[in-house]
């Protein structure tokens, strides 16, 4: 039964205590509002339709992300990248909204603004996917009641046109020269990236003890599975020429430094629209041009599916024409 009483400041406070349900209370400007609220809540309880939304209404998106990062992100391979996305969400105007308050219209506003700013569709999709998983965890694992996933009602950005950028021999030569003037390790990093089609993170976490004869054994991969990458004669020569480090790592540079140095080298070499990840695309395409099968290429590059490989295998038209005769 609800108890309604007027407070000293003139507002009305309604309290509901019912066996089997949490105690609830709320303040209102008028007695009629308090009575209406009490009747609705008690009616839902009687019909077994009551949902306790207090946690959903009192927990902000930023607070939820703080818990998510502690309990979920920490176990992920990409925790560092996810931390940056979480930080951006938490600091935004959406971070101060409660989980119950954030609507699909808010996320549509975010989507359109980010695309207008020039963010890629994939970048926006990743940010929205993070919000979606936050709500999935909050509903399923944390048991926060009264929530629905706002991303499920949202139109996601269309996939960006997949990059098909391959450097010419002249461009690669110019970038290698410029990179050598920036940092001594950069030319080897660039060449080995092309020769092996390794991801940036895989290459930079490579340890000397994992370079074994004609193979490099990758203990830390994006997919979390151990992988052996065959080394070409050129790749092996480049690795052998690098000085041994006391810490056992093959390279000293951090991933973000390599990306920055690569962009600077491209700028100095007057090479436009070339990203470090394009080197993996180039290396993968070269493997196909050498006649390797999809399964063979996948075992080298670590791509899990044929559809993922298609993203990288834009074979040179001249080579295809040669095969046709």
Protein language model annotation of sequence segments:
Residues 232-272:
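Active-site/catalytic core of tyrosine-dependent DNA strand-transfer enzymes
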Residues 140, 188-191, 195-202, 264, ...:
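C-terminal catalytic core of tyrosine-transesterase DNA break-rejoin enzymes
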Residues 1-29:
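Short, Arg/Lys-rich segments that mark the N-terminal edge of DNA/RNA- and chromatin-recognition modules
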Residues 166, 220-224, 234-236, 256, ...:
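Catalytic-site neighborhood detector that most strongly recognizes the C-terminal catalytic loop/helix
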Residues 24, 100, 144-147, 158-177, ...:
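DNA breakage-rejoining catalytic core of tyrosine-based enzymes
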Residues 152-156, 165, 169-174, 196-241:
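Conserved tyrosine-mediated DNA breakage-rejoining catalytic core shared by Y-recombinases
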Residues 43-46, 62-119, 134-141:
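Basic/aromatic-enriched alpha-helical hairpins
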């Amino acid at each position: 039964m609800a108890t309604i009483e007027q407070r000293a400041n003139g507002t009305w406070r309604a309290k509901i205590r019912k066996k089997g349900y949490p105690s609830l209370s709320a303040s209102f400007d008028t007695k009629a509002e308090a009575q209406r609220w009490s009747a609705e809540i008690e009616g839902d309880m009687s019909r077994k339709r009551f949902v306790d939304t207090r946690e959903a209404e009192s927990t902000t998106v930023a607070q939820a992300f703080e818990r998510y990062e502690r309990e979920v992100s920490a176990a992920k391979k990409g925790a560092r990248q996810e931390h940056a996305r979480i930080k951006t969400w938490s600091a935004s105007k959406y971070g101060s909204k409660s989980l119950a308050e954030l609507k699909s219209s808010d996320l549509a506003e975010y989507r359109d603004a980010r695309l207008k700013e020039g963010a890629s569709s994939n970048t926006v999709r990743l940010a929205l996917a993070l919000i979606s998983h936050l709500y999935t965890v909050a509903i399923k694992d944390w048991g926060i009641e009264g929530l629905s996933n706002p991303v499920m009602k949202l139109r996601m950005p269309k996939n960006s046109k997949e990059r098909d950028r391959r450097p010419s021999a002249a461009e690669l030569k110019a970038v290698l020269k410029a990179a050598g003037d920036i940092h001594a390790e950069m030319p080897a990093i660039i060449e080995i990236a092309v020769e092996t089609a390794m991801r940036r993170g895989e290459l930079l976490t490579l340890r000397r003890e994992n370079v074994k004869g004609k193979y490099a054994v990758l203990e830390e991969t994006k997919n979390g599975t151990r992988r052996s990458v065959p080394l070409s004669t050129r790749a092996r020569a480049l690795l052998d020429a690098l000085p041994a480090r006391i810490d056992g790592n093959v390279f000293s540079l951090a991933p973000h430094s390599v990306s920055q140095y690569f962009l600077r080298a491209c700028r100095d070499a007057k090479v436009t629209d070339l990203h470090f990840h394009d080197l993996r695309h180039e290396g993968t395409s070269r493997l196909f041009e050498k006649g390797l099968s999809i399964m063979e290429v996948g075992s080298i590059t670590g791509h899990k599916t044929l559809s993922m490989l298609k993203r990288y295998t834009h074979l040179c038209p001249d080579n295809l024409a040669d095969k046709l005769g």
